[in-house]
Amino acid sequence: MTIGDLIKNKDYDYVSYRLTLPGGDDTFAGCFASKGGEIIPLDGDIYDKDEEVISYEEWSQPEDDIQNGLTVVVKGEWIGG
């Protein structure tokens, strides 16, 4: 499943974009909204609709005006030192 698959039929006020870490955890790496299957960056970054999603969760946070929230976790590409 890709980010595009998740957003093609539902609009999200806020998508938390997270990357996996080498130890198995994940970390926040950016955010965007979606409308009509398109990504709308909220932080100026560029996101790829074709990126494979490892896991996801829908949520809401009405106190922050987020009715349709989504967290996606994608594979982090890390360069070893």
Label each region the model flagged.
Residues 12-15:
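N-terminal secretory leader/proregion of peptide precursors and effectors
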Residues 17-81:
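Acidic, low-complexity, intrinsically disordered interaction modules
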Residues 1-2:
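Short, structural beta-strand-to-alpha-helix junction motif
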